Amino acid sequence: MIKVYVIESLFDQSWYTGMALDANKRLQEHNSGKNRFTKGHRPWKIIYTEECPDWTSGRKREKYLKSAAGKKWLIKYIEQSGDTSSLPD
C-alpha cells in the first residue's frame, strides 16, 4: 500500500503533498532537511494520510489533492473532522 500524505509547516503553515511507502519515515526526512522544497519550512506535521493500492492510483490522488478542487475537499474534510488547527487563515 502507498500512502498519500499532506504535511503542514509549523513555521509558516504551508502545505506539502506527497506519497511514500512509509509516511512517518518520510516526515522524518522532511524534518531533517533532505528535501529541497520543505527544508526551509521546517518543522512539519502530518495533517492527512490516505492509503492507495498502488503507485498509479496514489499519484492520481496526490495530483487531485494538489488541485484547487482537492484543496477545497481537504479543507472541508479537516473541518468535518473537528481539527481546524491545520486550516489556512
Regions found by a protein language model. Give the residues of each.
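Structure-specific nucleic-acid interaction/processing domains
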Residues: M1-D89
